[in-house]
Amino acid sequence: MFKKNDRSQSRTRRHMRVRKKIFGTAERPRLSVYRSEKHIYAQLIDDVEGKTLVAASSSEKGFDSVGSNKEGAKLVGKMIAEKALEKGLKKVVFDRGGFIYHGRIKELAEGAREAGLDF
């Protein structure tokens, strides 16, 4: 049976394996996603400078009614896409953070795509 520690270690290993291949630039930043038990976080990162360009999460105001379920994840995706488009960023590289592309992670990605991000 998997213990929580085993799952988090497996996720970290998956993330490091994927991060060897995924790299964000100023023109095409990395859309990094983190999912906790209570919230979901997304940020656009320029790996060359090591800076976060745009960030959004379900812990911000206005998410009390939705929370961090699939609906909340989709709203976070739309919100990060709107903020990115305001800064002139349309193309991104998706970094699922070692999480399986399913459920809340998938909804966040679909919400970002619907709002205009290209990945």
Swiss-Prot record:
GO terms for molecular function: 5S rRNA binding; structural constituent of ribosome. GO terms for cellular component: cytosolic large ribosomal subunit. InterPro entries: Ribosomal_uL18_bac-type (IPR004389), Ribosomal_uL18_bac/euk (IPR005484). The keyword Ribonucleoprotein applies. Keywords: Ribonucleoprotein, Ribosomal protein, RNA-binding, rRNA-binding. GO terms for biological process: translation. NCBIfam families: L18_bact. This is one of the proteins that bind and probably mediate the attachment of the 5S RNA into the large ribosomal subunit, where it forms part of the central protuberance. Part of the 50S ribosomal subunit; part of the 5S rRNA/L5/L18/L25 subcomplex. Contacts the 5S and 23S rRNAs. HAMAP family: Ribosomal_uL18_B. Belongs to the universal ribosomal protein uL18 family. This is Large ribosomal subunit protein uL18.
